[in-house]
Amino acid sequence: MNSQSSRNETAATAVNGSDSAAASRDHKSGGGVLKRLKSRRNQVDRRPVTEEELRALGRDITPDEVLGLRAVARDYLCKLEDNIYNIDFTRFKIRDLETGTVLFEIAKPPHCDLDEEDDENRDADTSAGRFVRYQFTPAFLKLRTVGATVEFTVGDQPVTNFRMIERHYFQDRLLKSFDFDFGFCIPNSRNTCEHIYEFPQLPEDLIRLMIEHPYETRSDSFYFVDNKLIMHNKADYAYNGGQ
């Protein structure tokens, strides 16, 4: 996250573990390969767009369109059933890449099947499984490089050009936009990758405000397959842990 203008809102060069020989890969302890992905560089400015304008389109939303958003979305821009590929995130871990310290980790219990009543409750709650609240200590805002490892499964269909755009805001001020390419995922596969977040130094006055106003730092994570929005997750953040 940083306080740059939207003209410089993205981080380092795109590294696609599936499609590029330059991708960083490590072997996981349980076998298989861990792909490390960096955000795209050199995004150009997009025409500013509002959430209301995107809702009025009446068609699939594209990556270029969400890159025009200048404020956090108040609601979700797609439905749960738009995830026709049955992409399911099963594990998530955040660590400081400089020290290896794990800062946050959560995993979905195995064989976590919803019964009929749970399905009804999920239908009633549009944020079910799509919202996360984080609480970190103030020291998190001093970190320079953070790795976020995600493990996910896909259903019976191949997933092509899987992409995530994640935009962070503080009090509706755009702090940082990340843009990651997952690449191609074969049907019925389990996939693991680590997104590399590179954070420039934040101004001290902005750090103070972010600590003093917990959960006013928010993010939208938009997931696309073949340039069509299929998933939208949200999060908010507090940096006053331990105080």
Swiss-Prot record:
Task: Keywords in alphabetical order, please.
Answer: Cell projection, Cilium, Cilium biogenesis/degradation, Lipid-binding, Protein transport, Transport
Q: What SUPFAM superfamilies does the entry give? A: E set domains
Q: Where does tetradecanoate bind?
A: Y134
Task: Drop me one GO molecular function for this one.
Answer: lipid binding
State whether keyword Protein transport applies.
Answer: yes
GO CC term, one of those recorded: cilium
Highest taxon above the source species: Eukaryota
Tissue spec: Detected in embryo. Detected in larvae four days after fertilization, in retina and neural tissues (at protein level). Detected in embryos at the sphere stage, during gastrulation, somitogenesis and in swimming larvae, both within and outside of the developing nervous system. Detected in adults.
Please give the chief subcellular localization of this protein: other
Assigned protein family:
Belongs to the PDE6D/unc-119 family.
Note on domains (UniProt):
Adopts an immunoglobulin-like beta-sandwich fold forming a hydrophobic cavity that capture N-terminally myristoylated target peptides. Phe residues within the hydrophobic beta sandwich are required for myristate binding.
Protein name as it appears in the record? Protein unc-119 homolog B
Give the species: Danio rerio (Zebrafish)
Cite the source lineage: Eukaryota, Metazoa, Chordata, Craniata, Vertebrata
